[in-house]
């Protein structure tokens, strides 16, 4: 079809086109053509000679299935029989025989009979028996848009087509030899010119039979005639019973759909044609779900006029009523069927968006003409197809090409066809790629100027349309400017750049200049090319911008993200070079002053710092303006709404990635400037967090620190210069600190040559160990961290009036009374400052909870202080999100006890939002229902014990003032003192014995639990009226423990005068209460000759047949079967090197390295070896001894390491069985297969469920930070109660319980 360069509202041009010769892109004046007889060209001639054929299968007898010729009365004469059977039609218009020859052959019908049962003149022939003659330059195509739409029009010469499946015959052979010779001569002239059609190839037809049948004779015209009806009692099982699988169907007749039918009926009885009831098709309710895989190529073959809604409707009726009448079709099934049909019939290179839009249009037309409806059955939309309707419609985007039927194809042909399926237009490359020079050398300008519109022309156009088209041109101008900028970066800056300008940045050219090439290709191919094509084909009113940009968004994400990452590096390099005034900066100025750049104003800051970022930001603004002037009924309206969100999302992602890349680039630059001496103690990395080190690695120093500064995921949160507080009232010294996402680095600036370096002066602090502390003002109970700088630093003098700031009195110098905040940096930093005013103004304090080191920093303003505090708190929050699955949760038991002034911490630890302590405090505040500061008792908590007695849980707290008790879950009432004991070291309750054992001032005594509880319940009476009397068992006792199952009985263990004494309780036979404890056994502790200089006991681990005593020096294992002196654990009998070391005569005089010296060695193996020597020589302090998960392995906890031993007391491999600790462990408990290690400022929890795992490879599953943490529970298994400093209330102790988190809580 020919079309001038004028827009048409009924046509859509797909975005992608194959390029054509450049000469055909020019605007041409086409001669006016006579009006085309379009109805005879590509529409149905459905009203000529149609017969009224009723619905149903035409019955034939069994004897007539494959026999004599059929009477003429049963021959189809409708448009379908003329098309499919090849009968002549005097009313058909002349047609090029090229279409007849290259028409896609229909698929053969399935074979139902064997070779013997099929007659020679049977219409059923195997496809494998065909011997088709094909030209070597012709390919087999199906779905050819030029051939498949016009077979219903036959030439004026009367002819009958032979069966397309007969051997040796072409399916398009003419009946007359004279006609055959003429057509073959015409075909030979055109065969070479039309060999590049872009259509789908015919897939193989899945037939397994290879029957060889004889071809039909030329005179066997009876094959294409309708067979006679069968007998009324016979079942139609002939080939025609499944004729729908081949060429025709009963639904192919237009009478069924009443399209232009002269015998339209109105009753179902008349539709059946008054046939006998047994001939009517059975009506059954469909029950089977439909599968799109059931639609094969045979069925898709039977609808080739997909541009006509009536043809699609007839084909849908076959699918619904005939082929799959037992299936239930959902809404999505019907859409998929139409989608599959169009994709099958259209060429493979056909635009997918055009297919998708036409699928929607086809379904919308069916619904509007009430041919399809959707009923909701069981919450599912079921499709219902209505038959017998007059359905009409033509889809212009699917129309075939009919303009070049009688025209020869030549390079000099100036005619242009705009059909989407025109094979000539596709093969000749009419839509060629737009050259970049055509875009950057000229601009389209304004819409009115481009089309030379006068005010009179604009007055006739809708103002909204004028605005809409003007904004579309604004998009074009925006794209042209972006491409001009990218071309300047590649052609001018890129080609003139020399790598010698940046010798340390070898990838700068690829990141700064080559990165623009994919952007140029992206914008040219997906934006400007389709938009300019629309300008040429649609005229002044173009549409479909939203769909174009939607495609662009799908392709632009990865390219733009790479561009954002590259520009971050380019920005940092340019800024760095400008700061140092290198020769690269001089080169940039020379390029900026060149003629090309001055004329185009594409300076380096415009290209590299603005670039495509600005165009991406302006894009959704312009698209939103187009949307406001777009009518909601237009198809592009929804596309614009979607694409605006997609572009905004892309813009957000690009900005986010660009920001992260900038931060990472700063970190890379900082890593190049970081200086560290390998002999410094700072070269040691942490063991439990942040990775490990290896002495054999020759990597950079940063890798030895396990900081991962060059890792892509590493982030630099904040960095800058602050002032660090020093001792002896010296002026603060400036330091440069860098907060990373995994650690905090404290450095000082140094000059090394012409560059600036940063020397690491303190050990890096991991985020897991970093704690932020704040100072409280007396009289305030709780202060939010957000107002930290505004409240605490409001006045520089308020800190000097507090009695808890522990500051020395100010010394005023008689010679100089002037003071500054941080002193003069030019003066010596070692000079003593007598004034030191404003010391705590704008300051914050951090602490390394692993080492206990603290650092106080000062900032120059409150704004900088808030930046640091917010950055640190945000780092805490992100670190907590990475460990969202906690093994334990904490419950606050009480906050009623206060510190003595000398024990109270000066600064309070900050509990980050969402941390375990913060969550526990919030839950406690809701339960308490009162001010937590309303009551407090200044004392020191010594130990705790919770007792479950008579269905209630009582919490006993031993302090220096006595023993207090209350209901554990009662947050409304406070503690009640019941026992006047002031030096309780240990307290343990045994409910089975009904006794509370207390070790007070080295006196071991016990009280009756029922008496103690009764005293608590009688709170109204005074202590003098109801005195509680206990029984003293022994004096001079330093430790005791109760065993429920040692030697199959209960025993009392205690240490007295260097011996472990075991007592057995004796019960009263009448009251079943304990009368007294009698002696059972006695074990001697090792003497000082075995290097046991201190027999102070930390704990006793009791098992069924043995027990282990943890002293301050070592662990001794005793057996129950006999009395011996015990075995020292761990045993090194399997370690020859260590045994030789222990037998060395000069062992005690060897100059062993100190702990500080050992930490200078960065090797984990060397540190492990040092820890093993400390354990063997009794330098490590034992903390506790546990059995791991009821296995044959045991865990020995020391202050600096954890050791796993087997049942023989040996380490299988000391390199794998020793876990080094980053902190000094003061207490340990074993709770639910988890090992809880407690330090002064840190709690680490390890999972020991997998006993086979190497202990040295374990990492903590949970880390809790605090201050003045102490393990308070006397029982160290399955009970863990801790005491720590309250993070929000001054001088307050916090009593918390550690409970395992259930799996349901994780989920």
From Swiss-Prot:
Keywords: Guanine-nucleotide releasing factor
Domain CNH: 938-1279
A cellular-component GO term for this protein: cytoplasm
Segments for region (Disordered): 1-144, 164-194, 219-239, 780-802
GO MF terms held by the record: guanyl-nucleotide exchange factor activity
Classification via SMART domains: CNH (SM00036), PH (SM00233), RhoGEF (SM00325)
Record's keyword annotation contains Disulfide bond: no
Biased composition (Polar residues): 1-10, 37-79
InterPro entries: CNH_dom, DBL_dom_sf, DH_dom, PH-like_dom_sf, PH_domain, Rho-type_GEFs
Record flagged with keyword RNA-binding: no
Source organism superkingdom: Eukaryota
GO biological process: one example: signal transduction
Biased composition (Basic and acidic residues): 12-29, 176-194
Coiled coil location: none
PANTHER family assigned: RHO1 GDP-GTP EXCHANGE PROTEIN 1-RELATED, RHO1 GUANINE NUCLEOTIDE EXCHANGE FACTOR TUS1
Domain notes: The DH domain mediates interaction with RHO1.
Biological role: Guanine nucleotide-exchange factor (GEF) for RHO1 that stimulates the exchange of RHO1 GDP-bound form into GTP-bound form. Required for signaling of cell wall defects to RHO1.
Protein name per its UniProtKB record: Rho1 guanine nucleotide exchange factor TUS1
Gene that produces this protein: TUS1
């Amino acid at each position: 079809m020919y079309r001038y360069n004028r827009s048409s509202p009924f046509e859509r041009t797909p975005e992608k086109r194959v390029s054509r010769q450049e000469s055909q892109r020019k605007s041409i004046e086409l001669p006016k053509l006579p009006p085309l007889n379009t109805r005879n060209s590509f529409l149905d001639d459905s009203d000529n000679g149609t017969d009224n054929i009723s619905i149903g299968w035409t019955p034939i007898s069994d004897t007539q299935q494959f026999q004599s010729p059929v009477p003429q009365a049963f021959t189809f004469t409708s448009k379908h029989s003329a098309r499919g059977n090849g009968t002549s039609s005097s009313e058909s218009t002349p047609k090029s025989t090229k279409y007849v020859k290259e028409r896609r052959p229909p698929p053969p019908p399935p074979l139902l009979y064997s070779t013997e049962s099929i007659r020679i003149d049977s219409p059923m022939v195997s496809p494998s028996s065909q011997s088709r003659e094909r030209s070597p330059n012709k390919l087999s195509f199906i779905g050819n848009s030029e051939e498949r739409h016009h077979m219903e029009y036959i030439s004026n010469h009367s002819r009958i087509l032979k069966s397309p499946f007969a051997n040796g015959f072409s399916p398009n052979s003419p009946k007359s030899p004279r006609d055959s010779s003429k057509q073959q001569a015409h075909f030979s002239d055109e065969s070479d010119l039309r060999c590049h059609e872009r259509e789908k190839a015919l897939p193989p037809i899945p037939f397994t039979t290879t029957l060889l049948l004889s071809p039909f004779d030329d005179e066997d015209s009876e094959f294409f005639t309708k067979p006679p009806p069968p007998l009324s009692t016979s079942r139609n099982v002939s080939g025609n019973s499944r004729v729908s699988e081949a060429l025709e169907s009963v639904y192919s007749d237009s009478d069924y759909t009443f399209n232009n039918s002269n015998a339209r009926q109105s009753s179902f009885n008349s539709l059946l044609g008054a046939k006998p009831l047994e001939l009517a098709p059975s009506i059954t309710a469909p029950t089977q779900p439909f599968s799109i895989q059931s639609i094969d190529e045979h069925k898709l073959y039977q609808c080739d006029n997909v541009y006509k809604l009536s043809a699609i409707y007839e084909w849908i009726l076959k699918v619904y009523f005939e082929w799959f009448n037992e299936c239930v079709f959902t809404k999505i099934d019907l859409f998929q069927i139409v989608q599959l049909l169009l994709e099958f019939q259209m060429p493979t290179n056909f635009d997918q968006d055009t297919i998708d839009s036409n699928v929607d249009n086809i379904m919308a037309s069916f619904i509007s003409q009430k041919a399809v409806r959707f009923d909701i059955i069981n919450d599912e939309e079921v499709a219902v197809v209505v038959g017998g309707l007059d359905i009409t419609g033509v889809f212009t985007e699917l129309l075939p090409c009919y303009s070049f039927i009688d025209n020869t194809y030549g390079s000099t042909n100036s005619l242009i066809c705009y059909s989407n399926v025109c094979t000539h237009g596709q093969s000749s490359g009419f839509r060629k790629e737009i050259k970049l020079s055509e875009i950057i050398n000229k601009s389209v300008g304004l819409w009115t100027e481009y089309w030379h519109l006068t005010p009179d022309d604009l007055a006739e156009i809708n103002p909204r349309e004028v605005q809409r088209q003007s904004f579309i041109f604004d998009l074009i101008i925006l794209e042209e400017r972006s491409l001009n900028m990218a071309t300047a970066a590649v052609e001018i800056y890129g080609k003139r750049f020399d790598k010698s300008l940046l010798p340390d940045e070898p990838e700068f050219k690829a990141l700064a200049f080559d990165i623009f090439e994919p952007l140029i290709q992206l914008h040219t191919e997906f934006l400007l090319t389709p938009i300019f094509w629309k300008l040429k084909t649609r005229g002044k009113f173009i549409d479909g911008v939203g769909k174009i940009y939607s495609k662009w968004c799908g392709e632009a994400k990865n390219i733009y993200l790479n561009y954002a990452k590259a520009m971050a590096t380019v920005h940092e390099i340019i800024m760095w070079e400008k700061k140092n005034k290198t020769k690269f900066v001089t080169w940039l100025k020379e390029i900026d002053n060149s003629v090309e750049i001055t004329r185009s104003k594409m300076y380096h800051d415009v290209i590299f710092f603005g670039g495509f970022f600005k165009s991406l930001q302006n894009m959704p603004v312009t698209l939103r303006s187009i949307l406001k002037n777009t009518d909601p009924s237009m198809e592009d309206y929804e596309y614009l709404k979607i694409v605006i969100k997609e572009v905004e999302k892309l813009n957000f992602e690009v900005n986010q990635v660009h920001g992260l890349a900038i931060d990472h680039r700063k970190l890379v630059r900082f890593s190049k400037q970081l200086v560290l001496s390998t002999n410094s103690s700072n070269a040691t990395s942490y063991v439990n967090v942040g990775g490990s080190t290896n002495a054999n690695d020759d990597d950079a120093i940063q890798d030895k620190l396990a900081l991962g500064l060059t890792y892509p995921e590493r982030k630099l949160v904040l960095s800058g210069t602050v002032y660090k507080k020093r001792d002896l009232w010296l002026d603060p010294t400036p330091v440069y600190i860098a907060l990373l996402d995994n650690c905090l680095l404290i450095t000082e600036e140094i000059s090394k040559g012409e560059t600036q370096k940063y020397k690491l002066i303190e050990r890096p602090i991991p985020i897991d160990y970093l704690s932020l502390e704040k100072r409280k003002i007396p009289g305030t109970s709780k202060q939010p961290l957000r107002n930290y700088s505004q409240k605490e630093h409001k006045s520089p003098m308020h800190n000097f009036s507090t009695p808890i700031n522990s500051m020395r009195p100010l010394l005023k110098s008689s010679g100089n009374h002037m003071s500054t905040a941080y002193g003069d940096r030019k003066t010596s930093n070692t000079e003593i400052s007598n004034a030191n005013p404003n010391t705590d103004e704008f300051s914050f304090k951090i602490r390394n909870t692993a080492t206990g080191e603290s650092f106080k920093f000062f900032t120059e303003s409150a704004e900088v202080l808030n930046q640091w505090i917010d950055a640190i708190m945000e780092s805490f929050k992100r670190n907590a999100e990475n460990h969202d699955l906690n093994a334990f949760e904490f419950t606050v038991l009480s906050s009623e006890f206060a510190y003595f002034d000398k024990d109270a911490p000066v600064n309070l630890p900050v509990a980050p939002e969402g941390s375990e302590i913060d969550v526990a405090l919030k839950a406690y505040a809701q339960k308490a229902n009162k001010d937590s500061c309303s009551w407090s008792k200044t004392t020191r908590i010594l130990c705790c014990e919770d007792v479950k007695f008579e269905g209630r849980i009582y919490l006993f707290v031993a302090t220096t003032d006595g023993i207090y008790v209350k209901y554990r879950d009662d947050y409304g009432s406070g503690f009640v003192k019941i026992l006047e004991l002031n030096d309780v070291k240990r307290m343990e309750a045994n409910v089975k014995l009904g006794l509370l054992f207390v070790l007070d001032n080295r006196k071991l005594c016990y009280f009756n639990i029922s008496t103690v509880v009764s005293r608590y319940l009688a709170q109204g009476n005074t202590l003098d009226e109801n005195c509680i009397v206990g029984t003293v068992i022994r004096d001079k006792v330093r430790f005791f423990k109760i065993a429920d199952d040692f030697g199959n009985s209960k025993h009392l263990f205690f240490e007295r005068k260097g011996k472990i004494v075991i007592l057995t309780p004796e019960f009263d036979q009448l009251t079943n209460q304990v009368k007294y404890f009698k002696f059972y056994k006695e074990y001697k502790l090792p003497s000082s000759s075995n290097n046991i200089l201190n027999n102070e006991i930390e704990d006793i681990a009791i098992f069924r047949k043995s027990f282990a005593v943890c002293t301050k020096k070592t662990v001794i294992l005793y057996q129950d079967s006999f009395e011996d002196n015990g075995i020292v654990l761990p045993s090194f009998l399997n370690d020859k090197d260590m045994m030789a070391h222990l037998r060395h005569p000069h062992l005690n005089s060897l100059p062993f390295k100190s702990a500080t010296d050992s930490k200078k060695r960065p090797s984990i193996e060397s540190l492990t070896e040092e820890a093993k020597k400390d354990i063997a020589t009794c330098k490590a302090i034992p903390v506790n001894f546990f059995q791991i998960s009821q296995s044959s392995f045991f865990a020995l906890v020391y202050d600096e390491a954890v050791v796993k031993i087997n049942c023989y007391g040996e380490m299988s491999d000391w390199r794998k069985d020793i876990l080094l600790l980053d902190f000094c462990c003061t207490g340990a408990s074993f709770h639910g297969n988890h090992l809880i290690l407690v330090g002064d400022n840190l709690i680490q929890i390890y999972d020991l469920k997998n006993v086979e795992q190497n202990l040295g490879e374990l990492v903590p599953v949970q880390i809790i930070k605090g201050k003045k943490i102490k393990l308070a529970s006397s029982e160290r298994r399955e009970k863990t109660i801790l005491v720590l400093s309250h993070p929000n209330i001054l001088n307050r102790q916090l009593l918390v319980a550690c409970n395992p988190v259930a799996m349901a809580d994780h989920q």
